[in-house]
């Protein structure tokens, strides 16, 4: 039996509120396990990653521009997503993700097939589609009266719901 052991854990959730509860439960489990084993423990907390704040108006704007750019196999936004570093950004400013496929349907995102597909012309084209969608959405936000305000209002409402 080693005199010392070390573990690293990443705890994620689809919402910041749920994440806080899961973290509390995890700490209780560590405390209980240390009592049962008669050992001490030390916890060093790292960076917390939060869920994304949805802004459907912004997502719709990006999707429409991605379609105009000719992006293939656009997927609708996910209803729930895990925590991510981009979620932390989206707690400060409105953001959105568009998902343009460059891998065959059903390919696991954590696989060698996905990595290999990322080196293809289709993947490089997706960068262009994304850039065109962002440029078009930016132009719409600048040129359409009140559109930026709508995005900001939806962001503020959804941020309140997610805290």
State where each predicted segment sits:
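Metal-dependent amide/peptide-bond hydrolase catalytic core
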Residues: 1-163
């Amino acid at each position: 039996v080693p005199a010392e052991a070390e573990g690293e854990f990443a705890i994620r959730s689809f919402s910041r509120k749920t994440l806080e509860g899961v973290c509390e439960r995890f700490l209780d489990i560590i405390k209980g396990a240390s009592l049962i084993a008669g050992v001490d423990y030390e916890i060093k907390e790292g960076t917390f990653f939060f869920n994304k704040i949805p802004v459907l108006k912004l997502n719709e704007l990006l999707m429409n521009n991605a379609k105009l750019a000719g992006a293939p196999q656009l997927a609708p936004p996910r209803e729930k997503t895990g925590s991510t570093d981009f979620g932390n950004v989206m707690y400060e400013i409105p953001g959105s993700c568009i998902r343009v496929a460059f891998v065959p349907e059903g390919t696991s995102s954590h696989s060698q097939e996905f990595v290999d597909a990322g080196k293809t012309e289709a993947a490089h084209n997706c960068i262009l589609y994304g850039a065109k969608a962002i440029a078009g959405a930016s132009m719409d936000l600048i040129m359409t009266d009140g559109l930026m305000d709508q995005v900001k209002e939806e962001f503020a409402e959804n941020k309140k719901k997610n805290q």
